[in-house]
């Protein structure tokens, strides 16, 4: 099964997440199929907080990929995908 999920990077107490497409059996920071964006929860005012390729997300959702709850909430919070298209 394929999932859209977060992969943690960055420094201690200052996380930086990559939004990835990965097999469920892969470890959190392990092998992934494609990187479709990033999320920086500690971005400063002049920095980009989130970047997502919505076309690639839609492509993988059509192929049967599932989203984690955190990804679903991020997509709705930053209005990258309408909440009508979100099904988990």
From Swiss-Prot:
Domain of life: Bacteria
PANTHER family assigned: 30S RIBOSOMAL PROTEIN S16, SMALL RIBOSOMAL SUBUNIT PROTEIN BS16M
One cellular-component annotation, GO: small ribosomal subunit
Organism: Buchnera aphidicola subsp. Cinara cedri (strain Cc)
Name by which UniProt lists this protein: Small ribosomal subunit protein bS16
The keyword Magnesium appears for this protein: no
Gene Ontology terms, MF aspect: structural constituent of ribosome
UniProt cross-references to Pfam families, sorted A to Z: Ribosomal_S16
Sequence similarity: Belongs to the bacterial ribosomal protein bS16 family.
Family annotation (InterPro entries): Ribosomal_bS16 (IPR000307), Ribosomal_bS16_dom_sf (IPR023803)
Keyword Ribonucleoprotein included in the entry's annotation: yes
